Regions:
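N-terminal domain-onset segments
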Residues: 1-47
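Short, compact, well-ordered microdomains
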Residues: 49-84
Length: 84
């Protein structure tokens, strides 16, 4: 058995606050549904639609895979740090 480490990659991400105006234009094609009354956003991912709740999820853009997907805040903050 060998040990492996994930390769470092840079991503684009934002903490979803429920406002469509915050989304970069190129991410809009990944939106399946937006529930304006709750601010919940559903994005199209390789595994199917995924929900992002305001203040509970970051949205991450993996444009190499042509996808934008939500990640729970606690998981995001464990895995990522800001770059210059």
């Amino acid at each position: 058995v060998k040990r492996y480490r994930a390769k470092p990659i840079e991503i684009e991400a934002l903490l979803w606050q429920g406002d469509m105006a915050d989304l970069p234009q190129e991410w809009l094609t990944h939106v399946v549904t937006y529930e304006g009354d709750t601010g919940v956003l559903f994005t199209k991912t390789l595994q199917g639609p995924a929900a992002a709740e305001p203040g509970q999820h970051y949205l991450i853009a993996n444009l190499d895979e042509n996808e934008v997907y939500p990640v729970v805040v606690s998981v995001f903050e464990r895995r990522y740090e800001a770059v210059a």
